[in-house]
Amino acid sequence: STIRRVAVNYPELDGMYDNLTIRCQTLEEILADKLISFSATDTHIRHRDLWDIPWIVRAQEIDFSAVAALVAAKHADYRCPASLASMIAVGMQRAHVCYADGSFTGQMQRFLSPAVLDRTHDFDNHCDALNAIVERCYGRVAASLGISDQVEHARRRLATEISSGLISATGMPKRNLVLS
């Protein structure tokens, strides 16, 4: 965590909070949490993380060795059942599918105003760019941890499981619904 001054975003509050500081997470820790939560949750997809991850990376210079160390520590702390390499592979695959199948766009329409969506004239290309950023984030974490080969192996195994129908394209376990 870090201590930061409160940002004054409204002119009418100018001068009221100039000396106020708060303890908050660093952007590296927030990014690590989002990378873990997006790839490790298998009950629902956190589309908002796909918006936040590129925003965090573009907001300022990120120390990816710190992000990687935090991802590894959080993976252990949260007792994630999948290996770290498999979790990263699932995150990459899931991001690709969510950006490509329109589910990300559909979810973002709930959060973004029509004006913001209209400013992004070619949203498909925008999604491709966002996907590249997210994939690069996972890749940099894997490289920092020295597990890039393991992630690539996990990605190939994941592709095989998807093509054989064992899991969905988003890396989610297929669930059998019991109707009564």
Protein language model features and the residues they cover:
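Structured mid-to-C-terminal alpha-helical surface segments
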Residues: 1-179
